[in-house]
Structure formats: structure tokens, C-alpha cells
């Protein structure tokens, strides 16, 4: 599922 990929992307994006 892409949900897991989105979660990882969100986590990386939240690393501002």
C-alpha cells in the first residue's frame, strides 16, 4: 500500500 510510503514521506517532510 502507498499509505506506508506516504507516512514515511510525511515523516521525512516533517524533518524541517
Curated annotation (Swiss-Prot):
The lineage of its organism: Bacteria, Bacillati, Bacillota, Bacilli, Bacillales. The gene is rpsJ. Belongs to the universal ribosomal protein uS10 family. It comes from the Bacteria. GO terms for cellular component: ribonucleoprotein complex; ribosome. This is Small ribosomal subunit protein uS10. The keyword Nuclease does not apply. The keyword Ribonucleoprotein applies. Involved in the binding of tRNA to the ribosomes. Part of the 30S ribosomal subunit. Keywords: Ribonucleoprotein, Ribosomal protein.
Amino acid at each position: 500500500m502507498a499509505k506506508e510510503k506516504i507516512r514515511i514521506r510525511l515523516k521525512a517532510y516533517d524533518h524541517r
